[in-house]
Amino acid sequence: DPTQPPWGEAEHKEWQARRMEVYAAQIDRMDQGIGRIIDSLEKTGQLENTLIMFLADNGGCAEEIGEAWSKNVVGSISRRETRDGQPVQHGNDPNVMPGPEETYQSYGVPWANVSNTPFREYKHWVHEGGISTPFIAHWPEGIGDRGALRRQAAQLPDVMATCLEVAGVEYPQEREGNAVQALEGFSMMPIFSDRAHAREVLYWEHEGNCAVRKEQWKLVCKYPGDWELYDIVADRTELNDLSAEHPQIVAALGALYAAWAERCKVMDWSELQEMRRKEREG
């Protein structure tokens, strides 16, 4: 991110370092919790035949917590008070060191930039920095290769399809007389044995930011901009926009995206914003 200065030029270094320290401590806590689950599975003899899938749902989050942000989330994803009734101070204020229970901050743009390097953008957008995450699968009785790397692409809907295949159950077509939305995911079981994935095309949409990927080509839009085209194999960091050179590929991928958006009932972001505006105005 060219807007972010190098560490030598950064302001409030002590506060910035503390933000990452708190983030790292949260990761450590999560790791300890996962470790307790694994220990329990091992003690009960279930670890070898339990499929564990670990992944993030998006790239690094560059959201800075300010007053307006806090008003929208306090009471929903954060607490107004600590467990002993003390008020929680929300907001990324360099004069307040994060960490204690009575503070609520984020690690912000600088550390999200570190997390996502070398990819572009962050959570919310669908360039690689917003969507590319690691995925770990552990299942000793079901996955032959241990510690092996796989390079086939998959995405979140494939987790559901994988669970269905592992459990040996069919995805329902209706529930209580109502049709169920068709399953969009494809099982990742072939990937576990290093075979080709059934998924040929990947799709994304988040608040108007759109993308579709097929083979080496990725078509992506940063709302409200135009489509950009990248050879994601040769240019994973999305620096060389080839849309002007390959208009036929842009058209073909754009048609795939439009069909997917219609099938999955993706609302046009501009229309959705206008609908919300009218609702607010009564």
Predicted regions and their residues:
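A long, amphipathic alpha-helix that forms part
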Residues: 11-50, 60-61, 66-112
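Soluble non-cytosolic domains of exported or imported proteins
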Residues: 17, 21-28, 150-154, 182, ...
